Amino acid sequence: MKLTRMQFDVLVNLMEVQKAEPTALGISSKEVRMLVNELIKDGLLDETQTVTEKGIAALEPYRTKRVIFLAAGFGSRLRPATINVPKPMVRVHGKPIICSAIEAALQAGIEEIYIVRGYLGECFELLLKKYPQVRLIDNPDYETSNNVSSAMKVRHLMQNAYVMEADLLINNPTIFKKYHYTSNCLGVPVEKTDDWCVISENGYAKQLIKGGVNCHHLFSIYYWTAEEGAKLPAHLEEMFSSEGGRDLFWDIAPMNRYNEHYKIEVRECSFADISEIDTYNELQMLDSAYLVK
């Protein structure tokens, strides 16, 4: 059955905290009671407000099935740390950066993990023993194109999937969710930024730009529903084959060129949730092991 947004939110809230919280849901206690009674009547909850097998089945179309890491780049701004390893495999406090996201995904019950590799790709094989869920996909085009070439290698896997950069240090693993109702991107509300940001309208992304005001600083973590993930292959193929298309970031396709075909919710987080390590100096500030003794 097709769930309404509020039915979905109540079911997921009950699965996560075993109690429908009006504050978390953004509605009144009366509305929560009405929704709970409706879900009990439909057999999605039992009398103790526990999600039933029928309720779990109703949530299945919204379940996150996989995480795709785009990890083929050079990470040149992080040299010398990236001379011998790709940026996602640079260690922070003794652990490769990418492990923070892999472990957060596994904690959320997401079992399929794909890593598109390129520069020093063999280094990612070190992950296979600890994380047997990981599947490695090679991108031989990483030297001559932007990350759109990595997205092209996995374009048919983007349904019910997170698609993200592999060099984000996840400080708050709860940003990874087992269920999503809509496609979304992760962003922090800011008054002004010189970085990549999302211009939104009524909570939905309308454009991705470099530098903006009253916008959302973008963390490149996207979720795609089954319906919208199915649109991505054709749009990526068309952009990739267009003049200059190989030089673009992959998310220019859904966020800019073909945005009218997508409904991408801006999911808010904070700068404390994720660390972006863009330079060697930032790496040193985060982990004193990189300071010259």
Language-model features and meaning:
Residues M1-S28:
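Short amphipathic alpha-helical interface segments
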Residues P88, Q133-R135, K263-E265:
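Conserved beta-strand segments of alpha/beta enzyme cores
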Residues G26-K41:
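Short amphipathic alpha-helical interaction segments
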Residues F8-Q18, A57-R117, G121-F124:
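N-terminal glycine-rich phosphate-binding loop and ensuing alpha1 helix
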Residues I40-T50:
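A short, conserved structural fragment
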Residues L3, V12-M15, T50-V67, L218-K293:
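Conserved alpha/beta core of the MobA/IspD/sugar-nucleotide pyrophosphorylase nucleotidyltransferase superfamily
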Residues D9, E21, N172-G245:
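Conserved core of the sugar-phosphate nucleotidyltransferase
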Residues F124-W196:
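Conserved beta-loop-beta/alpha segment of the NTase-like Rossmann-fold superfamily
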